[in-house]
Amino acid sequence: MGIRIQELCKQFEDFTALAGIDLDIRQGELLALLGPSGSGKTTLLRIIAGLEHADAGRVLFGDEDATMMSVQARRVGFVFQHYALFKHMSVYENVAFGLRVRRGKARWPESQISARVFELLSLVQLDGLEQRYPMQLSGGQRQRVALARALAIEPRVLLLDEPFGALDAQVRRDLRRWLREIHDRTGLTTVFVTHDQEEALELADRVAILNQGRIEQVASPAEVYNRPSSPFVYSFVGAVNRLPGCVGADGLEVAGIVLSCPPQLSGWGAVDLYVRPEDLVLDAQEGWLAIVLWSQRSGPRMRVRARLEHSAHEVEIELSSATDEYVEGQKLRLIPRHYGVFFSESGG
């Protein structure tokens, strides 16, 4: 089931959490809401769940207006960062909880509940642990129980609020791959909040980048990384070098060299050029002359910090499959093979 967000606004006293959000979440996709603290990503997720209500705008589940629906009526599965498991209940009882609290005709017979619980424990790879209690499980196992509990009620939508934030790095990496497999098997429309770029880019079909209550860009992980739509996205997702320049009669000039001007850039004025470290390449003849400040090898990759000659501007370069060593004071020529250009605040 798809979700449509239309002109959603939310204010907390003097703080604007959401400022007119429009977003279409496709049926069956895994969408990441990525942004810094205070960007509005968790507020948006909670409004989709029905845990918060917007001041203005609408939330549609398919063609159904869910804006004023209760949490129960929306039938969403929700997984929190800190598990929210019942400590006094076994794994089995935690997963069965949402099914047992149903009333009337919606209540399943115990045999059906039991079958569903064991089906889910198998899905999340916790077979044989149904009688354990949360305190007897690792952090990764607890999060799997939380996901099984969310799936037990057969939700129309699955929502996850920084589900791996409390876990160590290796467990997070393992669970990311596992969650992607679970999503592909269930086909549920899934929205998850994260501030971890790597997590969003590895897991999601699409990423929505939020900043100060607004969406900066919605695109595939590759497009968000390779073709950011704004200076904020360039700066927030991945490492980037920023260099001032200008667009004039002679074209785009940055730090003393003329570069090809992107066709979408119309007008003249001061600009900022954004180029990722891996997109600065060595060139024997053309480009900026730079002086090495330091270098650091990490396996086959080499990271080099250099200062552009006759300039105070420093850049970071990442060279893959590098065989040469680079020493302080060594001179290099650099050319950007791929970059973004935006008018600066003073020039646009």
Swiss-Prot record:
Molecular function via GO: ABC-type sulfate transporter activity; ABC-type thiosulfate transporter activity; ATP binding; ATP hydrolysis activity
EC number: 7.3.2.3
Binding site for ATP: G35, P36, S37, G38, S39, G40, K41, T42
Subcellular localization: Cell inner membrane
Name of the coding gene: cysA
Annotated CDD domains: ABC_CysA_sulfate_importer (cd03296)
Gene source species: Xylella fastidiosa (strain 9a5c)
UniProt key word Lipoprotein: no
Topology class, membrane: Peripheral membrane protein
Keywords: ATP-binding, Cell inner membrane, Cell membrane, Membrane, Nucleotide-binding, Sulfate transport, Translocase, Transport
SUPFAM superfamilies registered for this protein in UniProt: MOP-like, P-loop containing nucleoside triphosphate hydrolases
Subunit structure: The complex is composed of two ATP-binding proteins (CysA), two transmembrane proteins (CysT and CysW) and a solute-binding protein (CysP).
Full protein name: Sulfate/thiosulfate import ATP-binding protein CysA
Domain named ABC transporter: residues: 3-237
Family per record: Belongs to the ABC transporter superfamily. Sulfate/tungstate importer (TC 3.A.1.6) family.
Taxonomic classification: Bacteria, Pseudomonadati, Pseudomonadota, Gammaproteobacteria, Lysobacterales
Pfam families xrefs: ABC_tran
Highest taxon listed in the record's lineage: Bacteria
